[in-house]
Amino acid sequence: MLASDPRKVGVEEEFHLIDLKTRRLTTRAPELLARLPDDVYVDELQQCVVEVNSGVYADLDGLRSDLERHRRLLVDAAEDLGIGVAAAGSVPLALPAEMHVTGTQRYGRMLADYQVLAREQLICGTQVHVDLPDRDEAVQVAHRVAPHMPVLLALSASSPFRSDGADTGYASARTLLWLRWPSTGPAAPVSSAAEYGALIDDLVASGVISDPGMAYFDVRPSVKLPTLELRVCDSCPRLDTVLLVAALFRALVEREVEGLRAGRKGVEVLPTLTRAALWRAARSGLEEELVDVTVPQARPASELVGDFVNSLRPQLEETGDWDRVVELSAEATAHGSSAARQRQALGRRGRLTDVVDLLLAETAGRTEHLPDVEVPPPREPGPKSTGAGRTRRYWSARFWDRGDTADMTWTESTELDEKKLVEWRRDLHAHPELSFEERRTTGVVRDHLVGLGLEPVLMPGGTGLWCDVGPETGECIALRADLDALPVAETTGLPFESRVPGVSHACGHDAHTTMLMGAASVLTKYPPPTRVRLVFQPAEETTPGGAVDTIAAGALDGVSKIFALHCDPHLEVGKLSTRTGPITSSNDSVTVRLWSAGGHTARPHLTGDLIHATAVLVTGLASVLDRRIDARTATVLTWGKVAAGQVANSVPESGELVGTLRSASRETWASLEPLVTDAICHLLAPYNVRYELSYLRGVPPVVNDPDCTADLREAIESVVGFDHLAEAHQSSGGEDFAWYLEKVPGAMARLGVWDGTGTRQELHQPGFNLDERAMIHGVRTLVALTRLEDQSG
């Protein structure tokens, strides 16, 4: 077809219905559909799903306008009922026992015939229809396009979680559920409409399906329309993804029709390989490798998508879609799948409700794209330095003792600054905000920086920011503070105690933020000799930490080294400590869920004896790690939760273990997940139990760079003197500052905040407080770091 008469395309979208109070699936589709036009909005197998049918269009702009209009009407009608709408292959919060199959005769028969398949069909897909009225051509083209379906599936992957919230490890778990049905998968290689019709008749006659509409092949001639229908894709929260898939599928159909009519063979791929490639796409999405079925071999998803788009350039140019598809496909591969965004949302605070909220917002078109957040790759190790042969001079590091730098000496100015520091800190302390919710805190910092004449850069999402101060130089030194508080109810009774129930600055981040604000004031008045970046980071208290988001947003671009301070209640005010090498430990989370046959304790041989298997895992995994890992790495597994059973005379059917795994060695940390996975498999092999391992990688150790540690020591000595600089011990706690040091050299020091008289209050505890006199030492140390210059000796 020519561009003047391109094939028309239409879309069917399926949407989950979400209770906006609980964020769970709700079976209120009949109530919602009663408020909507029945020619566009229709029911589905489950009462928690609504299908929306677009019109047909020759241009993508018309299709987009249609989809936007129908989504908006659906979202608005649903919100009036307290219902949210989510376009995704699956959603993570549901109670399957509360779900109901739609009460029509057809769906009732499907429930009777397929039982658990129908009951567990809590999934949604996107179907794309392309004009192809010749049924003989349609059945042949369906077979010719089959090898390319994995790419379209990967682009749409949006179902990483099961309905119970468990991470499946797949990008499209919907595909796994869908392929359980007897008439799914790649289309049969038939050569005519008559042959295809005979196949469908045989399936109906066999009783496996009850009508032709239940032939759920990945691509099929539509039962009711003169179209070829794509059925392999997950529902897509973002309309850009729907348009990309629709444009690519239309171009692919056009190319294969042209090839069929010209007598050219299509790509010949065995069905087994096609099925394997579909599995890989469901497993990996856009984040790992896909299978190039033409070779065959594994290739990065971005390469395969790019080659696929380029192969369709003639058809895309004919329809006027080339530029748009190039842009959308580049964005998709750069920023990853919906499945990856959902895992990112969960990783920030560990809340599945955040995943649901993300899907609701994207479906409604209420969010802008956030930079993809991936764990930064390790920095290539450079030659180690011992600091020998180096001399260093200060750029007036202790300029507060000099009267010739300004009319007001540092001693005079700090009397004012200390009062401001206390004022700022107490304001932040009274208004704590949890990770990725630090909007007020960000606003306070932003207003302060703008008032100093600086130009802060706000991070996507509105929490966190950074700005530069000083001259434009080749070198840029970064200073980092964290903004977030903890879900800990404060019990200090202070006049400025937290006003937010259940939330407090129990880790001293209010002081960290205050000290960097103070440093900004000093550096603005007394400009440093080199450019300094002040990084106010959100969400340190999450896994893998807001540092990952901050790096992805560009805060380290152009930075040559980075420093940070952390409050330490084990050091008195006036003292600081640091060390070369690891100063914190890695911090991973291990969750094991177990299932087995339950029963009476009088007959344990008829059960899986899950309690015994759990005990073996509790003791055995620690023993395996003790024997397989060098003891000098201080790798420790600690179980914090072991739950199974209710009463003494009943063997339980399920149990759960949750623990943390920490290591002082970065190399050991990198090897822990496969070691734990293998050990659990072998420990539980003799027992008749099923299990699911959820291994959440946290942060690696903070490993202080030798040269940067030398900088930090000299800055500290210039502030508090040699006698007040201590050698830090390595903490078993974790700190996401480690991610910065995976990218650039840097170092962290601990700042003493104990007043030396009362009982030490530990970090993360309800009674934690700090001696505010410590903050001025922190400000001076941060400023001193900006006034060092290396000199070759």
Swiss-Prot record:
Region annotation Disordered: residue ranges?
Answer: 367-390
Give one Pfam hit by family name: Peptidase_M20
Gene Ontology BP annotations: modified amino acid biosynthetic process
Top EC class, one word: ligase
- PANTHER family in UniProt: METALLOPEPTIDASE, PUTATIVE (AFU_ORTHOLOGUE AFUA_6G09600)-RELATED (PTHR11014:SF63), PEPTIDASE M20 FAMILY MEMBER (PTHR11014)
Q: Which reactions is this enzyme annotated as catalysing?
A: L-cysteine + L-glutamate + ATP = gamma-L-glutamyl-L-cysteine + ADP + phosphate + H(+)
Instruction: Identify the Gene3D superfamilies for this entry.
Output: 3.30.590.20, 3.30.70.360, Zn peptidases
Give GO MF terms, alphabetically. Answer: ATP binding; glutamate-cysteine ligase activity; hydrolase activity
> Which superkingdom?
Bacteria
Q: Which cysteines are joined by disulfide bonds?
A: none
> What is the official name of this protein in its record?
Putative glutamate--cysteine ligase 2-3
Identify the species of origin. Rhodococcus jostii (strain RHA1)
Write out the entry's keywords from A to Z. Answer: ATP-binding, Ligase, Nucleotide-binding
Positions of the UniProt region annotated as Peptidase M20? 408-793
Q: Which family does it belong to?
A: In the C-terminal section; belongs to the glutamate--cysteine ligase type 2 family. YbdK subfamily.
Task: Name the Enzyme Commission number(s) assigned to this protein.
Answer: 6.3.2.2
Q: What does the record give as the function of this protein?
A: ATP-dependent carboxylate-amine ligase which exhibits weak glutamate--cysteine ligase activity.
Residues of the region (Carboxylate-amine ligase) are 1-407
